[in-house]
């Protein structure tokens, strides 16, 4: 497991959590702009985590 893959998965987890908070706060405050930003951050986090997992798979084949 490479160091880059760990960083990608950690960044992804952070962005996903940040997005979930923004989404919930935006919902409670009735701020659709904040909700949209939260959904974008969650998607970004998922993609980063997937990239980290893919890097793990490729490094395992070496």
From Swiss-Prot:
Keywords, alphabetical: Stress response
Induction: By phosphate starvation, via the alternative sigma factor sigma-B.
Taxonomic classification: Bacteria, Bacillati, Bacillota, Bacilli, Bacillales
Record-given protein name: Stress response protein CsbD
Xref: Gene3D superfamilies: YjbJ (1.10.1470.10)
Top-rank lineage group of the source organism: Bacteria
Chain residue ranges for the region called Disordered: 1-62
A Pfam family reported for this protein in Swiss-Prot or TrEMBL: CsbD
Homology family: Belongs to the UPF0337 (CsbD) family.
């Amino acid at each position: 497991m490479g160091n880059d893959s760990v960083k990608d998965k950690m960044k992804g987890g952070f962005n996903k959590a940040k997005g979930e908070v923004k989404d919930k706060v935006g919902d409670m405050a009735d701020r659709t702009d904040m909700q949209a930003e939260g959904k974008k951050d969650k998607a970004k986090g998922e993609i980063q985590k997937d990239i980290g997992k893919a890097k793990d798979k490729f490094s395992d084949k070496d």
